[in-house]
Amino acid sequence: MQLFHLCLIISCSCPTVQASKLCLGWLWGMDIDPYKEFGASVELLSFLPSDFFPSVRDLLDTASALYREALESPEHCSPHHTALRQAILCWGELMNLATWVGSNLEDPASRELVVSYVNVNMGLKIRQLLWFHISCLTFGRETVLEYLVSFGVWIRTPPAYRPPNAPILSTLPETTVVRRRGRSPRRRTPSPRRRRSQSPRRRRSQSRESQC
């Protein structure tokens, strides 16, 4: 397995800090959390069950359909785009390595072990990363963070004291907007100044003059 890790760090050539976090943190057990700079954490993502995340293929198809132009652009779009690019590249290198190992290892048990490790362990981490950054680009980072916190609270609450259904990410923006509207004080548009009328005293003096 050490040979597998060595091959992975060599094959996964990562030019950016974000991608280096992915490789170094996973391979050598360093305390590096690729979600911290985005306000989340691995622990926060771990509240979501593994079957919550779509397959890598579905996530890659979603990223391609929604953000292909931005991902292929040489311009820097956002940190989420950069992280998404590197996660996609890393997964491609992992697949190449798994294919190479599967073709060159003579022992079927070892070959199956390596392929299974890539698909299960690394596959889940890639699925989490892809889902997080695609969701942040689609719904906004604050909404995704609110969803992760809401789901974490829901899943840790005993079934007898929580709603039957888990929170749904796609419904959070609407709820959030309604709640924010309720909090914000109603702004009153200033009315144009009216011309001040004459004081009663002045009007009274004018009436006396007219009587005279």
From Swiss-Prot:
Residues 184-206 are annotated as: 3 X 8 AA repeats of S-P-R-R-R-R-S-Q. It comes from the Viruses. Residues 25-27 are annotated as: HBEAG. Residues 184-212 form a propeptide. One of its GO terms (cellular component) is extracellular region. SUPFAM superfamilies: Hepatitis B viral capsid (hbcag) (SSF47852). Keywords: Disulfide bond, Host nucleus, Host-virus interaction, Repeat, Secreted, Signal, Viral immunoevasion. GO terms for biological process: microtubule-dependent intracellular transport of viral material towards nucleus; symbiont entry into host cell; viral penetration into host nucleus. Residues 165-212 are annotated as: Disordered. Its main location: secreted. It is found in: Secreted; Host nucleus. Transmembrane segments: none annotated. Residues 1-19 form the signal peptide. Sequence repeats lie at residues 184-190, 191-198, 199-206. GO terms for molecular function: DNA binding; RNA binding; structural molecule activity. Phosphorylated. Residues 178-205 have a biased composition (Basic residues). The record marks 183-184 as: Cleavage. Homodimerizes. HAMAP family: HBV_HBEAG (MF_04076). May regulate immune response to the intracellular capsid in acting as a T-cell tolerogen, by having an immunoregulatory effect which prevents destruction of infected cells by cytotoxic T-cells. This immune regulation may predispose to chronicity during perinatal infections and prevent severe liver injury during adult infections. Belongs to the orthohepadnavirus precore antigen family. This is External core antigen. It comes from Hepatitis B virus genotype B/C subtype adw (isolate Okinawa/pODW282/1998) (HBV-B).
